[in-house]
Amino acid sequence: MAFVDSTGTDFYLVATSVAATTKAECTTAIATAKRIKNLKTFGDIGGTRTVSESKFLSADDSIKSMGSISYGNMPVECLFDSADTEGQSILKTAYSDKSERKMIIKNTDGTFTVLNVKISASMKTYNIDEFVIYKATIEQNSEAVEIIA
């Protein structure tokens, strides 16, 4: 069984119209994509469902109904780079214009994870004796698809 190491993973943003359903399409897409550089953290990809539980007077039991999916968000941090015209710039632009982007994650085993995202937060953090950090919150806006072939 092969495991995927997170160190070395690359994160790219492209227009939602860019084809990314095969490894070849993903490789072509990231060749001209905006890469998020100096990424320190990335949150969890996935979602949860609302659960409704019904109980009955006539039985000591209950049933559960699974609601629709609510996708999560990923708080990301990277070293601030004012000259970064790629990743940090596109995160700021997507935040400002409220636009959706397609994120292509190149995993270290050569596979890809693809999902649509929006940006709900964009900020910088200044701490004593630390690098300036650029922070964004990436909102997952579609199911994540694993591209393995």
Q: Where would I find each of the regions flagged by the language model?
A:
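Charged, amphipathic alpha-helical segments
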Residues: 73-92
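Short beta-strand and beta-hairpin "edge-sheet" elements
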Residues: 105-148
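Residue microenvironments linked to proteolytic maturation
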Residues: 95, 99-107
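Short, charged, solvent-exposed linker or helix-capping segments at domain edges/interfaces
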Residues: 87-89, 146-149
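Short linear motifs in intrinsically disordered
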Residues: 1-4, 86-97
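Solvent-exposed edge beta-strands and adjacent loop segments
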Residues: 1-77, 120-132
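Short linear sequence elements within intrinsically disordered, low-complexity coil regions
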Residues: 8, 17, 47, 85, ...
